[in-house]
């Protein structure tokens, strides 16, 4: 379930006018920006942007980008984007940084539905005049490149049919490849990038039943390389995204110096989807409410905005 609290009735024109006053007056009114945008869903934000452009012949994103700063600006800017366009931006930033590129690309590729992933790929082409797979191929090499390109171009069956015989045979294929340390085996990439999530869950369950250990734990042996870590991330995203995102948040908050990029990414992308469920997983794992952990590690308008998206006013 979502944490976003948005009103059923709103006026896009009134919101656009209020936002104009917030960014064009004497000093930016950050509280007004948070109170409006932090309580509007994707459809409502799209209407506000359209109304703003019609009224002022300017995209709302431009004054937000120029008048706000730091982590607060980044969070508000990405939140205001259309979800598919936002993911295109996240993918491009990850690719260009070339560090931990696989985490963001795998999240987008493995957690979205086939239609959502297709929308992200279209948004990426429209924004950057390249395909995401083209840019990925240019900035990665070897087995990581093979895996990421296969995942980002996948269009999986999205139904609930399970082939038990196939789950059994592919659990054996995965076990043999891992046992032989053939982590770059083409069959692993084929299975992870073509099977439906329902089918993969059946395969992973069969693997655990047969081997007495989950496939994700089996991959993260001592000295695991980047490709093994990427496989592990893909399996976690496909199998249990809520637990995956809880760990991303935990790592972002508990590291020395908060990882604001990861913290912003999870809260902004999940607030309208399943952030309430992720909060529950976080509390069970850490015995601390996520809002409390975020409030302790952030400050100012950035903190206020994240807490608003988490459903808790500062």
Curated annotation (Swiss-Prot):
Ranges of the Annexin repeats in the UniProt entry: 10-81, 82-153, 165-236, 240-311
Cellular-component GO terms for this entry: cytoplasm; plasma membrane
Gene3D superfamilies per record: Annexin
An annotated Gene Ontology molecular function: calcium-dependent phospholipid binding
The UniProt record lists the keyword Hydrolase: no
Residues the entry annotates as binding Ca(2+) 2: 253, 255, 257, 297
Residues reported in the UniProt entry to bind Ca(2+) 1: 25, 27, 67
UniProt note on tissues of expression: Predominantly in developing fruit.
Residues involved in Ca(2+) 3 binding: 298
InterPro entries documented for this protein: Annexin, Annexin_repeat, Annexin_repeat_CS, Annexin_sf, AnnexinD_plant
Highest taxon, organism lineage: Eukaryota
Alphabetic keyword roster: Annexin, Calcium, Calcium/phospholipid-binding, Metal-binding, Repeat
One GO biological process term: response to heat
PANTHER family: ANNEXIN
Family in the record: Belongs to the annexin (TC 1.A.31.1) family.
Domain remark text: A pair of annexin repeats may form one binding site for calcium and phospholipid.
Protein name (record): Annexin-like protein RJ4
Organism, as annotated: Fragaria ananassa (Strawberry)
Lineage: Eukaryota, Viridiplantae, Streptophyta, Embryophyta, Tracheophyta
């Amino acid at each position: 379930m979502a944490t976003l609290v948005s009103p059923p009735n709103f006026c896009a024109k009134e919101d656009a006018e209020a936002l104009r006053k917030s960014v064009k007056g004497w000093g930016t009114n950050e509280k007004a920006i948070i109170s409006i945008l932090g309580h509007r869903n994707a459809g409502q934000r799209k209407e506000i942007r359209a109304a703003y452009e019609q009224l002022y012949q300017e995209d709302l994103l431009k004054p937000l980008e120029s008048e706000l700063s730091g982590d607060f600006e980044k969070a508000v800017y990405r939140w205001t984007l259309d979800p598919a366009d936002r993911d295109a931006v996240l993918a491009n930033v990850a690719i260009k940084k070339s560090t931990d590129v696989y985490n963001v690309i795998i999240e987008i590729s493995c957690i979205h539905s086939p239609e959502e992933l297709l929308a992200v790929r279209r948004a990426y082409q429209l924004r950057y005049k390249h395909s995401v797979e083209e840019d990925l191929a240019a900035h990665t090499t070897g087995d990581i490149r093979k895996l990421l390109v296969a995942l980002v171009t996948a269009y999986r069956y999205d139904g609930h049919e399970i082939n038990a015989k196939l789950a059994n045979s592919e659990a054996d294929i995965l076990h043999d490849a891992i046992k032989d340390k053939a982590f770059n085996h083409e069959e692993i990439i084929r299975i992870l990038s073509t099977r439906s999530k329902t089918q993969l869950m059946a395969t992973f369950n069969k693997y655990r039943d047969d081997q007495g250990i989950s496939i994700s734990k089996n991959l993260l042996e001592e000295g695991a390389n980047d490709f093994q870590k990427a496989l592990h991330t893909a399996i976690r995203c496909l199998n249990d995204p809520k637990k995956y995102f809880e760990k991303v948040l935990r790592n972002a908050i508990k590291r020395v110096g908060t990882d604001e990029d990861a913290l912003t990414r999870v809260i902004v992308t999940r607030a309208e989807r399943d952030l309430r469920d992720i909060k529950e997983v976080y509390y069970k794992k850490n015995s601390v409410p996520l809002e409390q952990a975020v409030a302790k590690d952030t400050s100012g308008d950035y903190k206020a905005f994240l807490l608003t998206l988490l459903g808790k006013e500062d």
